[in-house]
Structure formats: structure tokens, C-alpha cells
Amino acid sequence: MLSSWQGGPRPRQLLLWLLILAAWETGSGQLHYSVPEEAKHGTFVGRIAQDLGLELAELVPRLFRVASKRHGDLLEVNLQNGILFVNSRIDREELCGRSAECSIHLEVIVDRPLQVFHVEVKVRDINDNPPIFPESKKRIIIAESRPPETRFPLDGASDADIGVNSALTYRLDPNDYFTLDAQNSLEQMSSLSLVLRKTLDREEIQEHSLLLTASDGGKPELTGTVQLLITILDVNDNAPEFYQSVYKVTVLENAFNGTLVIKLNATDPDDGTNGDIVYSFRRPVWPAVVYAFTINPNNGEIRTKGKLDFEEKKLYEISVEAVDKGNIPMAGHCTLLVEVLDVNDNAPEVTITSLSLPIREDTQPSAIIALISVSDRDSGSNGQVTCTLTPHVPFKLVSTYKNYYSLVLDSALDRESVSAYELVVTARDGGSPSLWATASVSVGVADVNDNAPAFAQPEYTVFVKENNPPGCHIFTVSAQDADAQENALVSYSLVERRVGERALSSYVSVHAESGKVYALQPLDHEELELLQFQVSARDSGVPPLGSNVTLQVFVLDENDNAPALLTPGAGSAGGTVSELMPRSVGAGHVVAKVRAVDADSGYNAWLSYELQLAAVGARIPFRVGLYTGEISTTRPLDEVDAPHHRLLVLVKDHGEPALTATATVLLSLVESGQAPQASSRASAGAVGPEAALVDVNVYLIIAICAVSSLLVLTLLLYTALRCSAPPTEGACAPGKPTLVCSSAAGSWSYSQQRRPRVCSGEGPHKTDLMAFSPSLPPCLGSAEGTGQREEDSECLKEPRQPNPDWRYSASLRAGMHSSVHLEEAGILRAGPGGPDQQWPTVSSATPEPEAGEVSPPVGAGVNSNSWTFKYGPGNPKQSGPGELPDKFIIPGSPAIISIRQEPTNSQIDKSDFITFGKKEETKKKKKKKKGNKTQEKKEKGNSTTDNSDQ
């Protein structure tokens, strides 16, 4: 084989390889691209298909592919457009390190025929790496004795980039002691040194902190920093120094052994042992100094050693040396002058005589309290004594003679502020140092009755339920007296007054010692709503002092009164009402009304009405208003209905538990057009006593109407005469409403005080009738000025607002806190946010909401004496000359009398309180179109009849 290799075949093989290489170079080419490092995914590199001379359509059929030994995933070719792009992150420092050249070699292979192309992609460096020092803090220790221009080598920073991006420059923070020396090479920093500029002084600056910054040459440039902490080592170059070169001190001749004379202090700014100091007496030392004094070598304290004698030696001069512990010790010196002082060894003596204690707190200033004498056995200045007294006390010392003083009261005393004073008298001589003596005296202050008992507040409010047991405790009053002993002993008593017809002491009593207030008898809310009285507190001093406190006892209502029925006439039996009604009435016609009152208040007086059925399941053509008591028809009546109906109405309050009363209503049906007398006689045989009762009611109604008409005519005549007369003080005049007030006894008082009034658009002004609770203060009169008529003319245009000076009574305030839900009184008024619950109102016969209202409602927890009449904002109440208000209030009763006649088409939810079934008659009269004046007189007569029934 060797021979064959060396023979003819060898040239042929060599020629074959040369041909293959030539064909390879002919069929293959090499492309060069460049791309920056850290390029984003999809960054364009080159049109590789176009540069290789390949058609885009033949890339896929010829299986165009890219291969790389280690970095095949960094670059990729899009076979759709033949573009070479960046596929993943390229980090030049990771690929090539610090090599100057960095390339990615790819092999592009296509088949049919097989071709291989070499592609070289050069990765360009970017400035993405900052300079980095080996450590963030570098500590350097330099002795303060190092001379200037001394160099201290430093470690430079490194930058992973290449070229300009890795060319580093350094800078050092400006300072007076160091500078930076940097020598650059072509590739990297070769040497970096810290050069000392001037001599260091550790005593001035112990440590230097400098910041060394390295910046590369990239754009933008990146920086790196290292903190240089330079510690200066100490050198013993400072000697100890005393604060003074000469010290002067004094010492008493009787000083004990070990008494501190002075503590010398020398300082050495050096560090360590170079700053440790040793104290000693500087040689040569006199024997007298060694005998009398000693020095502590560590802290420099000089103390007495032997007995000093002023008469033997008055002054010592001592030289003291301070030496440090450095390798070459350095020393400092000072001179100490010790002066021995004469001793003041006798203290003053203080004597206090003629004490007048204790003293009364009303003692006048300048009064003498005690005599004080002082003495001192020393002579000269050591025997001169001065006295002083405790500061900030109402006493003073007055010198009367040499070494004699008087203790005098300087200002007024107040035992309640300070009850005793501890006084200290200090006597001090004139020695150096001086001696002193003290004497204490306790001055007590005797009490004087100068403070009256004081209550915590001037008025208390107490709430007590009615029907309380006799003798129950309702409240406790307490007064404090700042005095002492008997002057502070407080006793309590009632301030007697009359409550109505009875004495206050019949209602309540107060315990003289404890101040407990007791109710002596059961309280009745209906009789007494508010009991206001005063309790007096007096001390036992001479003379006694006292003060009063006001108690307002509100009696809270309990449901202890059942509803009471109001009968329509004197001839009716209690709880029984008889009414006649025609058969032709339609549904909703009001045929009768049950009236009841409750003496309680609040919910306890809120009444509801229920119709009791005679048999279970029985159906009758009547219903009763839940809160009005009006009995109305539920359907039109026919012939099959019984001619007589006996209805039982249950009246119930809302107390806990509820109390009830039962009313019996006898209804008799008559034919239309049949006279009541004829019907009564016709049914006399069948009904018997009931028919007789109907006859009596008819005659009674006729009589009441006649009397009422006469009363109305009398009132009209009286009003006309009063208004036509010249106005005098307190007389009735146009524009001046008359205010009617009710007292607890039911009497009426009149005044000309201005109150809110209701004015109409035409006709004379209407007189207001206002009833106030007995708990309110009495009505006060006020004179009217000349501007009254101008105000009245303005009043004709629009309603006046309610007087803000008026206040509700206690019962009214309590009742108005209760939420009243009435079924038929129209209490829900739509608002922006939905129905708004308000107080139900009692309105006049008009169906419009602008009619007059009485607020709050009947039986809604409000005392009837506190109601006032008002008109709605829309249409003021129209009234003719001489007319009375449509409604007025009976004092002491929640019933409201209606003078206007109810129209025929009124529904059962109207809130008129009293009707006697005369609506059918009114309807017939309207059809006949009788005169308005005759109609109004009859309507007023009916209302007057209602009033007389109540």
C-alpha cells in the first residue's frame, strides 16, 4: 500500500481533491452581516435569499434551512420573504467575552442540487455594562506621620464592554488632602493611585470619606463608584495641656482628711496610649505639701492628707505635672495655689415666741402672728445674722430691732384654698462660708363661714310616672359647702309655696340631711303635669348661708283613664245615641257619629272605633271610621233592610293595656218624604220605646237649633257694636286679634298681645281663638303702635307665618314625638322621596287640601288645651262679616266644634268631628236654592247645637 500511495495513484487523488475544492468554492459563497447586541426580536439582519441569488419560490421546495453549531436559535430566516432576523436575545459579552471580534457563523443548506453557503453575522458591541469596582467600600489606613506625595495603590474598575465603551476615566471628590493619579493603557487601566497632598492631622480629622467614580466612553456613559474610607492612625505628637497655667483654690482649716481640694484635668488630643495621662507633684516637692496633700495619678484629684492650720500656714504653692504614655513621653505643667480659710464654726440660733395660733381666715393684713429673735456666738462678719422666710406665702418678716423680727400677715387668707402654712425661718450669718439655722412653725387657718352651699347646677328636671306610691323617692339634691366642720354641715328644706289651692308640702317633702325628695301622695298627670318648686340648702354656720335649686318635676302619663263617651243631649242615656235616617241614602252617607274623649295624653288618649257585630258572620250595611267615629253606610239601603238597627261601637285607646268603652247607636229608617212625627207614630206600636226616643230627639234638635240661632244673632250684634265703637286701650279693633288663654282653673284672660292670625283676601280680619296649656306662662299684654294698620294691609295679601315666640307645652312636646298613623285623616302626603308621614289634621268641610287644619289630631297624644287653629297655604279661609271661625276648641277637651255644615257629597274620610245626620236635609235645601244668608244661619245653628251637646 505504501508503494501504491507513493506511486501513480497519489497525483490523481490530489488532483481529484483540488477539483472538488474548486467546485465547492464555485457552488458555495460567504455572506457578511452585522447586528447590534441586545437587538429586539424580529430585528432585520439581511435579505439572505436575495443575497444568495435564490428565488423566494424555491426556498421551500429546495428545503432551505439554516444551521449553526452553538447558536442556531439566535437568528432565523423567514421563508416567505427570505429575510434573516433576530430570533432571541443576543448578548455579546456572553457569546465572546472580552474578545475584540464577535461573530455568529451560520451554514445555509439547500437541496436539488445540494448547496452550502457560509454566513457570518458580526455582533456589534453597545454600551450596556457599567464599570464595576471589586468592592463598594474600600478601607485604607494611613498614619498621620506619612509625608506628602505618598502614593497608595487602588484597584481599578472593570467594564465588560469593548472598545470605546470600555475606556474608563476616574474622578475623585474634591478634598484638601488627597488627589488621584491614573495612568491609562490602550486596553484597560494599568495603574490607579491615591496621592497624599499635605500632612495629615488625626486630631483635626480622624477619618476621611471620599467617593471614587469610574465612567466609560459610551454614549450615554455609564458610571460605577466605590467609597474610600481612609482612617488616620495616631502618632504621639501632642503633649498634655491644662486648661489654666495657675489654679487658685481655698480650703477650710477644719477640712477632714480626704477632702477634695481640686480636680485637675489635662487633655491630650492623641489617641490610645498616646493620650493616657499620669498626674504627679513636680519635683522638687516641699515636705509640707507632701504632708498636707495627696494627688491621684489617674484622675488628677488633690485631697487633704493631714490637718491644716490657718495660723501656721495660710497658702500652699504646688507644681503639678501631667505626662502621657507615648513611646516618647511628653509632659505638661501647672501651678496650684491653695489658700487655707478661717472656719466659721458657730451656727446662728433662732427662737420663736408669742405665738397666737391658729388664726382666723378673716384676720386683717398687718396683724402680728409671732415674735422671732436670733443670735450667733461668732464675732465679726461671722456673727452678723440675717433672717429670711419661706417665699410665696401671705406672711412676711419685719425687723423691729437688731436681731429681733416680727412675723406679720401680709395678705388676706382663704382657708378653702390653703388650710395651713408650714413656715420656715432661716437665719444666716455673714461668715465665709456662712452657717445657718432654721426654725419651723405651722400656722393653721381657722374656718369662717364665708361660703354658701352650692349645687352642681341651678335647675334639675325630674320625670315621674303618675300614680306613684305615696312616699316614693323621686330625686336627690346635693349641695357642697367649701367650708369646714359645722360651717359645711348642710341641711335641706322646701321653699314653701302654693300649688293651685294646696300647699307645696302636701305634694313633696325633702329629707333635711340626705336631700332626698319624696312624693307624699300619688301624682295625677291629668291634674298636674308640671310641679316646679325650689329646695333650699343652708349650712350650720353663724350666720347661716344658703342657696336654692329649682326642680321641675314632669308627671308622665299612664293609661289610667278609660275613654268617656260624649252624649249628644241631656236626655240621652249614657253611651246611647238615637238617630233617624231616610232609606234613600246612598253608600258612604254619614248617619251618626260617636264622640269620646280620654283624659290621658299621648298614645293613651289616641282613640280608635270598632263596630261590634251582634252575631258572628252577620253583615250590616254600616261601618264606623277607625279614628273619626263616624258611622256611614256601606251600600244603598233597600226595602229588605230592617227598619231599626242597634249598633255597638267599641271605643279603645292605645295605652298598655288598652282601656275601652262601648256606645250604643239606635238607627231608625224612615221613608223619603215621611215626616219624622208620622214615622214615629206609625212605628210606635212595633218599636215601642225606640219610637218614643226618636220623637224626643226630633223635638230636642228643634229646640237646640232655635237656641243656637238666638245665640248666633246675639254674638253678631255684640261684635257689630264693639267694632263700630271708637277703639280704646284693650278694645276690639280691626287688625288686632284677640288672644284667649286658658288657665288651670278654666278661666279666660284677654290681652292685646300680637299673635299669628289668619287673614283673608276680602272682608274684615278674623278673630283667632288660641288655647294654651296650663303649664305655659300666663298671657302678657303688649301695646300696639301706629304701624298696626300698615301691617294689617300687608296681612290681607298673604298668610302670616306662625309666631316663633310660641312654645308647645310639655304634654304637646311629648305627644308630638309619637308617630300617628290615621287611616282616614289623610296623613300621608306625597313628597320627593315618597310618602311623608305627618300629623293628621282636622279640616273643614271642603275636600281641598287648602282647607283649615288643626294640628296635631284629636286623641293623638296632645293635650287639647295646646291646639291652635291654622289655615292651609293655598286658599285662605273666606269669611263674611260677623262670621265666627268654622271651628273652635273646647278647653280641656280634644273635641273641636264645627260650625259649617258638611256638604252632602262628603266622604267618610273627612275629619269633621260632630254631625247629627242632617246632610240629607241640607241637600234638599240646596236643591230648593234658598238664600245664602238663611242657609248659613241654619248651618251655624246646627254647629251651635253640637256645641251644646258637648
UniProtKB/Swiss-Prot annotation:
Cytoplasmic side: 719-950
UniProt-listed InterPro entries: Cadherin-like_dom, Cadherin-like_sf, Cadherin_CBD, Cadherin_CS, Cadherin_N, Protocadherin/Cadherin-CA
Signal sequence, renumbered to the chain: 1-29
Record Pfam families: Cadherin, Cadherin_2, Cadherin_tail
Record topological domains on the Extracellular side: 30-697
Classification via CDD domains: Cadherin_repeat
GO biological process: cell adhesion; homophilic cell adhesion via plasma membrane adhesion molecules; nervous system development
Cell compartment(s), UniProt: Cell membrane
Keyword Transcription set for record: no
Mapped PXXP repeat ranges: 734-737, 774-777, 799-802, 832-835, 873-876, 891-894
Keyword Ion transport: no
6 X 4 AA repeats of P-X-X-P: region residues: 734-894
Chief location of this protein within or outside the cell: membrane
GO cellular component: plasma membrane
Chain segments annotated as transmembrane: 698-718
Function noted in UniProt: Potential calcium-dependent cell-adhesion protein. May be involved in the establishment and maintenance of specific neuronal connections in the brain.
Protein name, as recorded: Protocadherin alpha-13
Gene expressing this chain: PCDHA13
